[in-house]
Amino acid sequence: MKFFALFIYRPVATILLSVAITLCGILGFRMLPVAPLPQVDFPVIMVSASLPGASPETMASSVATPLERSLGRIAGVSEMTSSSSLGSTRIILQFDFDRDINGAARDVQAAINAAQSLLPSGMPSRPTYRKANPSDAPIMILTLTSDTYSQGELYDFASTQLAPTISQIDGVGDVDVGGSSLPAVRVGLNPQALFNQGVSLDDVRTAISNANVRKPQGALEDGTHRWQIQTNDELKTAAEYQPLIIHYNNGGAVRLGDVATVTDSVQDVRNAGMTNAKPAILLMIRKLPEANIIQTVDSIRARLPELQSTIPAAIDLQIAQDRSPTIRASLEEVEQTLIISVALVILVVFLFLRSGRATIIPAVAVPVSLIGTFAAMYLCGFSLNNLSLMALTIATGFVVDDAIVVLENIARHLEAGMKPLQAALQGTREVGFTVLSMSLSLVAVFLPLLLMGGLPGRLLREFAVTLSVAIGISLLVSLTLTPMMCGWMLKASKPREQKRLRGFGRMLVALQQGYGKSLKWVLNHTRLVGVVLLGTIALNIWLYISIPKTFFPEQDTGVLMGGIQADQSISFQAMRGKLQDFMKIIRDDPAVDNVTGFTGGSRVNSGMMFITLKPRGERSETAQQIIDRLRKKLAKEPGANLFLMAVQDIRVGGRQANASYQYTLLSDDLAALREWEPKIRKKLATLPELADVNSDQEDNGAEMNLIYDRDTMARLGIDVQAANSLLNNAFGQRQISTIYQPMNQYKVVMEVDPRYTQDISALEKMFVINNEGKAIPLSYFAKWQPANAPLSVNHQGLSAASTISFNLPTGKSLSDASAAIDRAMTQLGVPSTVRGSFAGTAQVFQETMNSQVILIIAAIATVYIVLGILYESYVHPLTILSTLPSAGVGALLALQLFNAPFSLIALIGIMLLIGIVKKNAIMMVYFALEAQRHGNLTPQEAIFQACLLRFRPIMMTTLAALFGALPLVLSGGDGSELRQPLGITIVGGLVMSQLLTLYTTPVVYLFFDRLRLRFSRKPKQAVTE
């Protein structure tokens, strides 16, 4: 009593307290970062190693395996995958959430150092690592185009000047430059000219290497001067290499230009990048795992003018893709939804109270509670994101509930003739415990969420804490500011004021009277109501089992990623043509704004595309509908497939897959894996629950096997090393020398001119100089035959792995797909040597599915414990919790009606309903108990009176919560895929709960009261006997 009086009779102090809360909230709001979702990125580090010319199997056994054994000992590694292709290996390490990325990086470097002695000596450089997830979509893509500069020169500008500067910006984890390679001097040898001159490829390599030497020459001194010695020992350009003498034939000099075409070109000609229809260099920028995407993008944009000034004017630097606009638009949509929710909630209050003065009170209390929450969000290190703003939107209905309960009870006393200050004190005292019970039990719902681990726990923590803080501040405001404003602002209603909104008032009275009549009938037919209640429990179980489920709603971020997978024997020239064809198909689509792509590198038969869609306001279709439309057009391209997927704000795992979800096959028997993977993939491709089924197992590439006749080699004076060196010199784009420039180092690359390697007969033109100086054709001691070889070798942990990726067709859920995959694996009878498991997002979905029911039960148990403590009763909490089955039925039916799968967002809605719908029962039970204790009423009379007395606040609080969530259901635009499932769940649950709990709660109350009386009589009877 004294607590309430302290604030009611000291209005200045109360107002200043509220102002302080508001000011702190405004300050916190201005300092909060902006993000699409809470920070849930796993710490990921990528280790890269190269050995030019080495086969995928060689890279896997000699490079990947030693590194994996060393890296696998690092603490906190949750997943380690590797992919080895021609000349390169990439290992992805995913760490536990609580692992510090910088500490992990130090451990990775130590593990690389420990494995160094086990790696091949011919590696041009030590393995390197990057603190970025290569499977993440870039947060920004910059393109360089020019009509005057070559692709190699553009790549040089990008990698030498732009990429290092961008990498230094806070939040940037990796800048990947694609579309070409560094400039180089390329030596294209003519095998016939070499044969005619009697010059071996090794002779050419040695001559070039010896002619380009960078070593110190020292200095000369006399008594007074010192001269630094400088020589022309370096060759910089193709023109300087052409006259180089490599051999003397019959006294005549054989120059490099006589036997080769020397050009200023690039290190690897098998790279291509495009933006729209123009050749381009791409800078794909990825953020650090812990970085804020909006802040990072803003920092990059702020540096762009400076970057532009460092490159020539003839080079056009453009932003091809930026993920931040759709994120900002999504947050603006949520903010608008929040404002609409506040307005609707206040409108509900006005309609019920029919007083402008009374409406001002919750109109002040709601903003104070919501704004004050921003301060706590800042102190907790949160961000303004879709989930935290959705929490505030939902909180609108919650925070007004406390104010409504207090305000309505004070208004009831005023209508009875009590003076304002006395009514404020008496009314607050009566409902203070009710408000406390509602708030604490609602906060209790979120305790299991706060204790939940893994990605779902991280994802929901900000939502739970934000909502809990808003409820806590609302509790404080409703017991301090609200009664003070009521005491000083409200007056007894005058007849003229009571006539306002007479239509709504009469309707409410008629509704209350009709409810009273129906409630009397229900209380006389309690068994029927009990059957209905048991039926809702059974219906809940059936609906939850049958409803389609997924991990997270499929978002339309306005960005698509595409992975090109072509025939494994395709040439680079043909692959570049496929890239151009696919880009034209996509560029012609009316919903596409920009498209960039690249192909080449160590995996010639693959490529990547990044597609920016037009803003949501300029297109009628969703991203998934656009993908469905494009899929039909892309399927007509022969010899290659382009798999499209919408970029999501949440992506789990480090695998670079061509689809959104993955199923990984593991085996310690590589032969068994290669035998069963095609069977499983083909089976999964026939399932209607899956789309775009593809695999990263590529073991059918074209290979030419050379078989040496060692006896003949020995007789001819040729060893295997010389023969292998010949092949590397001829076909391996061998880097034979380094050109040092002030800004970078460039390579001299030697190979047989591509004009002479158009078919297999090129091998017949190759020759080796033996130990007698004679030219011996390769065909004298070797024969060759075509065969198949892997283009890549993949590991997970230390086991051979193959990952099957898939998307979901329209109308299918992840639970449908996972169940279909499990059935298919059973039907195929896959042996125990091949193990299958879901990976990435699909794996997290499986883990979340197993914990959902436990989480809901834990939330209910927590609420029961809190209510039991507050009411000092084992029974009354059960009465209050009896409201939950009807809410669950309403929520699940609404999701099925709107064809929305049960996702993590819908789970939040269910948890919220646990907190919302019990409020009605709390108000009924509290007033019924008070009536029994102080009014000498029977239990049936007490609960009947409590239901009628609290009918208006029950309707107000329910409608306030419903209208607070309704904008989430009706919202469109960016980010609506996240908001709608939450709104649908809450609105559906509230509607069904309101229809049933007004009748089931009184019946359950009487049932438990009779049960209590029956058990209390038995001990007495035993004593008398």
Curated annotation (Swiss-Prot):
GO CC annotation, single: plasma membrane
Key words, A-Z: Cell inner membrane, Cell membrane, Membrane, Transmembrane, Transmembrane helix, Transport
Membrane-protein topology: Multi-pass membrane protein
Gene3D superfamilies attached to this UniProt entry: Multidrug efflux transporter AcrB pore domain (3.30.70.1440), Multidrug efflux transporter AcrB pore domain like (3.30.70.1320), Multidrug efflux transporter AcrB TolC docking domain, DN and DC subdomains (3.30.2090.10), Multidrug efflux transporter AcrB transmembrane domain (1.20.1640.10)
Recorded GO MF terms: xenobiotic transmembrane transporter activity
Leader sequence segment: none
HAMAP family attached to this UniProt entry: MdtC
Complexes and interactors: Part of a tripartite efflux system composed of MdtA, MdtB and MdtC. MdtC forms a heteromultimer with MdtB.
UniProt function note: The MdtABC tripartite complex confers resistance against novobiocin and deoxycholate.
Family statement: Belongs to the resistance-nodulation-cell division (RND) (TC 2.A.6) family. MdtC subfamily.
Identification of the protein by name: Multidrug resistance protein MdtC
Protein's organism: Escherichia coli O1:K1 / APEC
Originating gene: mdtC
